[in-house]
């Protein structure tokens, strides 16, 4: 239907990956670490779906640029790629996540705990999301950068 280099195909893959990944991981963090109720977390996750739809493709483009810059300056090493993936994820997602929690009425302490936990968990999560995104792009047959 769309060519592997199609922007729509790429945007669809990026959107699918971000919505699925953030829903599952975000709910786990909010309930298990931040002390949010199931209802608060579900509200946050449901609000995050349209937000993630809006930011998924811009994040994918941002991530690709960060990875390309890291590759250009640090080579194509696993560690360089992992640190770049982590930086891209944390620098783009943390402000968005804090805003979502604020909108659903989480307390300042809950927001601080959730965002801080997310930063710590992002040591693995941001890199893991990068691999999940690449997997989804392959599923959608997107030409990888």
From Swiss-Prot:
Keyword Phosphoprotein: no
Organism, scientific name: Pectobacterium parmentieri (strain WPP163)
Keyword presence, Coiled coil: no
Biological role: Exports L-alanine.
Protein family (similarity comment): Belongs to the AlaE exporter family.
Transmembrane segments: 16-36, 42-62, 86-106, 111-131
Pfam families: AlaE
GO biological process: amino acid export across plasma membrane
Chief place of localization: membrane
Keywords: Amino-acid transport, Cell inner membrane, Cell membrane, Membrane, Transmembrane, Transmembrane helix, Transport
Topology relative to the membrane: Multi-pass membrane protein
A GO cellular component entry from the record: plasma membrane
Full protein name: L-alanine exporter AlaE
One example GO MF annotation: L-amino acid efflux transmembrane transporter activity
Protein's cellular compartments: Cell inner membrane
């Amino acid at each position: 239907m769309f060519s592997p280099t199609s922007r729509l195909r790429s945007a669809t893959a990026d959107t699918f990956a971000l919505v699925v990944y953030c829903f599952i991981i975000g709910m786990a963090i909010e309930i298990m670490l931040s002390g949010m109720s199931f209802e608060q977390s579900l509200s946050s996750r449901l609000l995050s779906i349209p937000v993630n739809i809006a930011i998924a493709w811009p994040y994918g483009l941002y991530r690709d640029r960060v990875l390309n810059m890291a590759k250009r300056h640090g080579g194509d090493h696993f560690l360089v790629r992992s640190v770049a993936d982590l930086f891209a994820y944390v620098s783009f997602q943390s402000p968005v996540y804090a805003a979502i929690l604020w909108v659903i009425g989480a307390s300042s302490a809950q927001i601080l705990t959730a965002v801080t936990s997310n930063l710590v968990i992002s040591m693995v999560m941001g890199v893991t999301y990068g691999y999940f995104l690449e997997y989804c792009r392959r599923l959608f047959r997107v030409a990888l950068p």
